[in-house]
């Protein structure tokens, strides 16, 4: 068997699957190495994809030609758009998925990609020659040769699980950890640390009193994750349920804190701030009498349920006793307890924006090994790493995304510029150009770039062009079509908005909050005829995109002007230009940070914590600006 590849991806989680698929689809001979072929793209924690800002990332992955969105649509058992009460910049898709069907849908995709081979094994060592990675060795003593390697090992590097005082080595429940690989990489001067995450109990649904819980239904409209022309819902759509903890449960949890790995010194690593354990919640918020819990199905046919909001590493007996104090769980039976896991990660400031190591050429890092948390954040990094690994093998310009192009761009820029001291989770608040990074236009932003790269194929590109043309036609019609006050005022009163004193353009009416493209078209026959010309199955998607462009035109334009101004600083390259130690006009902290991160541009330098505006002015002067 030939063990020589262009690209090898270590780990078949969400980052690894996207990385391997991208590299192979671009034409690189690719190998994806995983400990267990039956666990590819395993959803280790919540059986859900998307959420606030995360849903936008999944749509961006899809727009780039990735697969997470397609697999999610294919295996979703509940779909919702979050933040509907806010503006479209904040709307985020989220889906519950069938955990096992998600795995097998991904495996079917991977096994049918030309150029992609899957190998089941554990990697123990990378081979580096003259500062460049050239291969790896596995525990089966197989040597692989590669031009590029992408590390996407998730929580498996020296993983250690905790339930109370019990500690068990492993990368996930009932799965072994990966040893020696961290040390092999660290030998070459790459710094690493430890982080922690956790997961809640899994509950036998036959023991739950659903009548004592509130139901949470999904939505059945046209929204989905993928921009491809696929059917909206494939599987039976299921409910979720909500309830609350109570003071009795909190007292049980407090009494168990002495045996909590988080509070007795057993766990020293930092956990995710925005997904705290239940014991952290009751300690951090002692006055809060209840915390909301979400009970979520693990699949279409299983009785297994995931208890969102009750992540814990307390002893199993404490977890069960506390939950039984909640009326809906008074007869609780669990499949397994919640647990915490500690694992190795690598400081992401040691990476370029392509996710290639600055210290070892052709070695890329993506996913949780970079200090992030979440399937979506992992997948976004994975597709960028896979693309750039292919480019390193076959030539071409590095492929990066700017902060005004994608949430993936914000994510990677934050990682490589600011670093992490806790697991990084994406939020809309991390993006300064939220109005430009909406869920509805990820295809408009990214698909053409991926098409030029060769990752997006003709069918997806044709869908983009037809959608773009239809949206432009609608916007142009409303911009040019004149409305007479006498002919529309009765309709405006029916729609609950102020009558006109004089004529206006149709676009001015649609800008009103009470007016939508669909409701005003019922009173403007010419506009209705224009909309009826759209025979595309995605008509609702097209109308939504056009309406957002119309209603938010001013905000979008203003944000674009700001982004373009700051983009000028991105054009001022400074990497390798300065000996920062010798620049006494910079603050001491700035010299240290600039030397460590070695930013590519003035704009990146300006985002480094500890580098002040006056330090940036010094660099601008020295750059001749």
Swiss-Prot record:
What are the transmembrane regions? none
Q: Which SUPFAM superfamilies match?
A: FAD/NAD(P)-binding domain (SSF51905)
**What GO cellular-component annotations does this UniProt entry give?**
cytosol
Listed disulfide bonds for this chain? none
Please list the GO biological process terms of this entry: tRNA methylation; tRNA wobble uridine modification
Keywords, in A-Z order: Cytoplasm, FAD, Flavoprotein, NAD, tRNA processing
Entry binding sites for FAD: 11-16, 123, 178, 368
Cite the binding residues for NAD(+).
271-285
Task: Name the SMART domains for this protein.
Answer: GIDA_assoc_3
Q: Which GO terms describe its molecular function?
A: flavin adenine dinucleotide binding
Co-factor requirement: FAD
| Pfam families in the cross-refs | GIDA (PF01134), GIDA_C_1st (PF21680), SAM_GIDA_C (PF13932)
Report the subcellular localization.
Answer: Cytoplasm
- State what this protein does: NAD-binding protein involved in the addition of a carboxymethylaminomethyl (cmnm) group at the wobble position (U34) of certain tRNAs, forming tRNA-cmnm(5)s(2)U34.
HAMAP family associated with the record: MnmG_GidA
Q: In which family does this protein belong, per the annotation?
A: Belongs to the MnmG family.
Query: Per its UniProt record, what NCBIfam families does this chain match?
Result: mnmG_gidA
Quaternary structure, per UniProt, is:
Homodimer. Heterotetramer of two MnmE and two MnmG subunits.
* Protein name as it appears in the record: tRNA uridine 5-carboxymethylaminomethyl modification enzyme MnmG
Q: What is the lineage of its organism?
A: Bacteria, Pseudomonadati, Bacteroidota, Bacteroidia, Bacteroidales
